[in-house]
Regions:
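N-terminal regions of proteins, emphasizing targeting and processing segments when present
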Residues: 17, 36, 173-176
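A short, hydrophobic C-terminal helix/tail in secreted or cell-surface proteins
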Residues: 165-185
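Generic structural signal for beta-strand residues in well-ordered domains
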Residues: 15, 163-165
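Short, charged juxtamembrane terminal tails flanking transmembrane helices
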Residues: 189-194
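Short alpha-helical segments used as structural interaction elements across diverse proteins
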Residues: 1-5, 184-188
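Hydrophobic alpha-helical membrane context
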Residues: 16-20, 178, 188
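Mature extracellular "passenger" or substrate-interacting domains of secreted, surface-exposed proteins
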Residues: 23-163
Length: 194
């Protein structure tokens, strides 16, 4: 088998399996509305300087990613969202188990398909994470015992339907080699042998 035929075959194989998926930043520029223990006035948002008032439970994602987006009105918890879908809840004090629940409506962000616990530091008990609908998530922190500045992290992800396929590096290289082989074959004026 000639080299150019081998290159053509390798290029076709590489193109057939070279796609990888890149997930877009799902919370970039998101406007998030939150409730704490079922009450809108239980959450204080960054856009309102964490002060109570109408609409204080809605805030945009912090573009500097330097602080939390929400504080609970009892100042027990700070809630931080990152643009790549990581949610972190931080206890500002030692917090005994009690009835603590939070809901977050992510507004126009991409639909959430998975919400998984990724880490816990300085707390005991298991929080309950749930997806209410494609844009709303809930945390039930009842039965969780928090030490001061303990935290939990959870990852929000979108499904494969929103992933953007991109060709992998090997596929691009093999595609270029295939193009060169085809051009070379066309210039020679000969018909390829099978």
């Amino acid at each position: 088998m000639k080299t150019k035929h081998l290159l053509q075959a390798l290029a076709l194989v590489a193109l057939g399996q070279g796609a990888v998926h890149a997930a877009p930043l799902m919370l970039q520029d998101a406007s998030i509305t939150a409730t704490y223990n079922g009450a809108a006035d239980g959450m204080l948002g960054l856009d309102h300087d964490f002060a109570a008032g109408p609409g204080a439970n809605t805030t945009k994602l912090d573009p500097t990613d330097t602080g939390v987006e929400f504080l609970t009105s009892d100042f027990l918890f700070g809630i931080d969202f990152s643009a790549d879908g990581l949610l972190t809840v931080i206890a500002n004090y030692a917090v005994a188990p009690g009835a603590y629940s939070m809901r977050f409506d992510l507004g126009g962000a991409l639909p959430v398909t998975t919400f998984t616990l990724t880490g816990m530091e300085g707390l005991t008990g298991i929080p309950s994470l749930s997806i209410i609908d494609s844009h709303t998530i809930a945390l039930d922190l009842s039965g969780v015992d928090w030490s001061e500045f303990s935290s939990l992290s959870a990852r929000l992800e979108t499904g494969p339907a929103v992933a953007v396929p991109e060709p992998g590096v090997p596929a691009i290289l093999m595609g270029g080699l295939a193009t060169l082989a085809l051009v070379q074959n066309g210039r020679s004026g000969r018909k390829p042998r099978a």
